[in-house]
Amino acid sequence: MVFITKFARIGLQAARQLSVTPLGAVQARAIHLTSLLAKERRYTNKHEWVEVVSGSNAIVGISSYAQEALGDVVFAQLPEPGTELKQDDECGALESVKAASEVYSPVSGKVIEKNAEVEDTPALVNSSCYEKGWLFKVDLKNPKELEALMTEDQYKAFLSSSGDH
């Protein structure tokens, strides 16, 4: 304890000599809530997710629950870049050995990229639905639409209440 006290005293003396402002006097910078939410994934009741990655660009995919329900995905049809989408538009399809499912856009905007790796290797949807298995990128037309989508906690509650796990 004596060592810490001596060390602190030496540090304060050095700070005074160097004209360093003590930490308590430093003003905190404001952090905008939108920057904190930028990496938050939002979900639809049809099991698609959307995550803002930068500015108005977002990536879209299907949830872990959806990929498990589909089974081994063997085919992916994704929207072409340049396609204008409205929220809830059907924009693609995923087929597995046991089922087929349409993909709906969780947000309005213009498709800026499709995940060609998923079209070449559809199993990425199963092995990495949130990282490598995303479906397409979109330039958001109306970012406010994100507010109506479910947070991760709300989505988990939705799955529990609907009997889906």
Swiss-Prot record:
Q: Which InterPro entries match?
A: 2-oxoA_DH_lipoyl-BS (IPR003016), Biotin_lipoyl (IPR000089), GCV_H (IPR002930), GCV_H/Fam206 (IPR033753), GCV_H_sub (IPR017453), Single_hybrid_motif (IPR011053)
Give the protein name, as stated in the record. Answer: Glycine cleavage system H protein, mitochondrial
Lineage of source species: Eukaryota, Metazoa, Ecdysozoa, Arthropoda, Hexapoda
Q: Which cofactors does the annotated protein need, by name? A: (R)-lipoate
Q: What does this chain do? A: The glycine cleavage system catalyzes the degradation of glycine. The H protein shuttles the methylamine group of glycine from the P protein to the T protein.
Family membership, please give it. Belongs to the GcvH family.
Where does the protein end up?
Mitochondrion
GO CC terms, sorted: glycine cleavage complex; mitochondrial matrix; mitochondrion
PROSITE patterns assigned to the protein according to its UniProt record, in alphabetical order: BIOTINYL_LIPOYL (PS50968), LIPOYL (PS00189)
Q: Which UniProt keywords apply?
A: Lipoyl, Mitochondrion, Transit peptide
Q: Which Gene3D superfamilies is this protein grouped with?
A: 2.40.50.100
Spell out which residues are annotated as carrying N6-lipoyllysine.
Answer: 98
The UniProt entry, under NCBIfam families, shows: gcvH, PRK01202.1
